[in-house]
């Protein structure tokens, strides 16, 4: 038996990703039915959900196609276990491995499809929370992002600002964790998501989200391209779906100019390097509005400007390098997404900010080639290496003026993302390793 369910509505777009569910199990029972729908939380792909009954491979169901930000209607399938695969209409995303979902008889479920990098996957959400008291709505939050780490969620008045001493409404949500249900008086709220225990590290701000009387809402937090920031999807039980896409990116500036030069840098309205920063110096990630943003730099009081093109949810490093009289500016995209939690691999790359290097850099880590042909003002790709307690770094160059660098020490942990910044001059390099996640 095969059922095909078509798209019936498209909801507002602004974020991505997933939420949790209860997965029932057991064999298929034709007398018990569950209601299921597909929600497409990808940025631009049209999706179809294919289900195959684990009890009877001849029993299948197809939901879709659903456009990005859209949903299918609820339709019935036999209760029991099903294998689920989400595919795109144009093969623009690679399906994750097939998932196994359980649908209980008389249950209602939302299968939320999401993307991460170039892949698409899905999670099963049980639409089964109890109704709140009159005048209230229920909110629960599910952190589906394996990239963003442990998160706190603050529910504030729409005009409020997040203070440093505030307590989270829902706290310490690790990847795959669903919060308890929290009742809220019906109305509009500002939601702020931060790194756990650190309100200054904002990962998403939703300026206004409205919950109506008797609403039962699940808010899913999902990964972005950079890894640290998140998007969100609000799913009202048996109701509408709205996506909230992050409107910001994270940017850090690295001053790799002549030694002891005073440097400032700002992007849009955000300060990247404050007054009195001395080169060489590596800044920290700062939130900047996405899109086209002016980059303003001063070196010893002399101004230089450029423009940054920032994707929402992205992480970027802006390198200011070369002679202070005519500094060059380049921006590179950073990938701070997590590696698989199994295994002992980590990601490592090199950023070359050497002044006056007439050649390129190459790096081996514990005799494994990590980077080659890294020109000045550029970053290598990420190389995967095995974690080590005291790794051996060997940095070489095609320019004889750089006599090489060899060092042992430190600790590189599995699933980490690291950048080696090579600053200074070939004769006096300044080498710093930064753990980006």
What are these regions (language model features)?
Residues 23-437:
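Intrinsically disordered, low-complexity polar regions and short flexible loop motifs
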Residues 18-22:
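C-terminal motif of bacterial Sec signal peptides marking the signal peptidase cleavage site
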Residues 1-12:
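Bacterial N-terminal signal peptides that target proteins for export
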């Amino acid at each position: 038996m095969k059922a095909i369910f078509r798209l019936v509505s498209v909801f507002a777009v602004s974020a991505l990703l997933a939420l949790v569910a209860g997965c029932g199990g057991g064999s298929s029972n034709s007398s018990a039915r569950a209601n299921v729908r597909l929600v497409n939380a990808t940025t631009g792909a049209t999706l179809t959900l294919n289900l195959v009954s684990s009890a009877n491979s001849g029993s299948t169901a197809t939901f879709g196609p659903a456009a990005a930000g859209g949903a299918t209607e609820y339709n019935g399938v036999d209760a029991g276990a099903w294998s689920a695969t989400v595919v795109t209409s144009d093969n623009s995303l690679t399906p994750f491995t097939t998932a196994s979902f359980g649908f209980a008889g008389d249950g209602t479920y939302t299968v939320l499809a999401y993307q991460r990098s170039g892949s698409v996957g899905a999670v099963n959400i049980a639409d089964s929370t109890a109704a709140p008291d009159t005048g209230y709505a229920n909110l629960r939050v599910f952190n589906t992002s394996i990239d963003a780490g442990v998160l706190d969620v603050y529910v504030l008045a729409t005009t409020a600002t997040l203070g440093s001493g505030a307590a989270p409404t829902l706290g310490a949500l690790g990847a795959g964790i669903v919060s308890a249900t929290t009742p809220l008086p019906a109305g509009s709220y500002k939601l702020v998501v931060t790194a756990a225990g650190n309100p200054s590290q904002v990962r998403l701000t939703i300026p206004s989200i409205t919950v109506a009387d008797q609403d039962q809402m699940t808010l899913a937090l999902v990964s972005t391209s950079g890894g640290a920031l998140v998007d969100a999807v609000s799913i009202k039980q048996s109701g509408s779906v709205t996506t909230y896409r992050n409107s910001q990116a994270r940017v850090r500036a690295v001053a790799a100019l002549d030694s002891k030069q005073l440097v400032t840098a700002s992007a849009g309205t955000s300060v990247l390097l404050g007054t009195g920063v001395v080169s060489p110096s590596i800044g920290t990630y700062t939130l900047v509005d996405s899109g086209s943003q002016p980059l303003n730099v001063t070196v010893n009081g002399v101004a230089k400007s450029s423009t940054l093109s920032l994707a929402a949810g992205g992480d970027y490093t802006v390198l200011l390098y070369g002679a202070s009289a005519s500094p060059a500016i380049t921006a590179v995209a950073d990938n701070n997404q997590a590696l698989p939690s199994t295994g002992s691999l980590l990601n490592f790359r090199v950023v070359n900010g050497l002044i006056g290097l007439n050649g390129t850099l190459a790096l081996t880590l514990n005799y494994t080639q990590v980077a080659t042909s890294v020109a000045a003002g550029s970053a290598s790709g990420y190389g995967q290496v095995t974690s080590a307690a005291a790794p051996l770094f060997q940095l070489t160059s095609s320019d004889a003026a750089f006599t090489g660098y060899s060092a042992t020490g430190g600790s590189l942990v599995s699933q980490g993302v690291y950048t080696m910044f090579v600053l200074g001059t070939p004769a006096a390099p300044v080498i710093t390793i930064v753990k980006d996640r």
